[in-house]
């Protein structure tokens, strides 16, 4: 184990499905000596997720981000959705679309195909299923 008050994973760019459940869950603090504590239990306190941006950016399938959000929610782990990157799922920001851009489809063997649209990082936004996910871990000093 690595001694740290908060352990986090930055899953960006998220380019495939990830299962973090073996490393999530509740932890207990144990005092091992006066003024010295250690934690027992899973290794992740916070998960940050984001798509890829910039030249040559590859799309992130929406279900990959949803899966990590759902894993975090089930385990009580803080989840922060940083960005979609250059692509946004069709229907995510219908009201801000213009008649320019490219359509693509993101899919892999485990998840169904989804239409996505090339956008600027700013226009793609930060909402996942209608809300921003700005959770931060609770730190006990």
Model-identified regions with their sequence ranges:
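Auxiliary Fe-S-binding modules of radical SAM enzymes
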Residues: 21-141
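Glycine-enriched alpha-helix->loop->beta-strand junction motifs that scaffold or abut catalytic
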Residues: 3-6, 43-44
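Canonical radical SAM enzyme core domain
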Residues: 1, 9-22
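Short, surface-exposed basic-aromatic patches at helix termini and helix-loop junctions that form
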Residues: 1-3, 70
């Amino acid at each position: 184990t690595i001694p740290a008050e908060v352990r986090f994973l930055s899953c960006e760019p998220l380019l495939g499905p990830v299962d973090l459940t073996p490393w999530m869950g509740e932890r207990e603090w144990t005092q091992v000596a006066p003024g010295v504590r250690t934690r027992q239990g899973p290794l992740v306190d916070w998960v940050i997720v984001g798509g890829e941006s910039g030249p040559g950016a590859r799309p992130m399938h929406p279900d990959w981000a949803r899966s990590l959000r759902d894993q975090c929610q089930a385990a009580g782990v803080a989840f922060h959705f940083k960005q979609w990157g250059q692509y946004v799922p069709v229907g995510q920001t219908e009201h801000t679309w213009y008649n320019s851009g490219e359509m693509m489809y993101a899919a892999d063997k485990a998840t169904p195909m989804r239409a996505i649209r090339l956008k600027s990082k700013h226009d793609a936004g930060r909402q996942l299923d209608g809300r921003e996910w700005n959770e931060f871990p609770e730190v006990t000093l």
